[in-house]
């Protein structure tokens, strides 16, 4: 068993949950976050004694620092929290767009900022930010998502520069075939 702790924001479903399972399988400790406290804690309990669940809604960035205050040293951070969106220019929903920009750009940034003094400053520490393929291949209704995911690229580049030697990478998957979004 390892003393390494990996935080997976958005770790209660989808890719985030699968990554959390992989972290545990490798012998590390994982902290998963999700918006719903009861659900997050239940999923952490299912993952076992090397998992902890914390309620965290990164679309409310002013609460992030306080919600993560109890964490010790962090050896890896995965930012995989998302919300689905179908915002077109003809039916543009400003409030929905603001929420998504806040969640993915401001929320991701504030999460890194809140954990900065606890991120092990070594090349063995990594941060992974999830964007999405829509940054390069937009689809009908992806106006906001495509724009935000382009912003994730800029964020990855800036964080890599500012946080070296910590590794910072971005992943931009397309629609995952076994996800609920695929069924829609």
Model-derived regions, located:
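Rossmann-fold scaffold of SDR-type NAD(P)-dependent oxidoreductases
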Residues: 9, 74-83, 129, 169-170
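N-terminal Rossmann NAD(P)H-binding glycine-rich loop of SDR-like oxidoreductase domains
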Residues: 12, 20
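Conserved glycine-rich Rossmann-like NAD(P)H-binding loop of the short-chain dehydrogenase/reductase
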Residues: 26-42
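Rossmann-fold cofactor-recognition segment
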Residues: 46-62
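Conserved Rossmann-fold cofactor-binding substructure of NAD(P)-dependent oxidoreductases
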Residues: 59-73
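Conserved mid-core segment of classical short-chain dehydrogenase/reductases
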Residues: 79-98
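Catalytic loop of short-chain dehydrogenase/reductase
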Residues: 90-91, 99-101, 107-111, 120-164, ...
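A glycine/serine/threonine-rich, flexible loop-to-helix segment
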Residues: 176-184
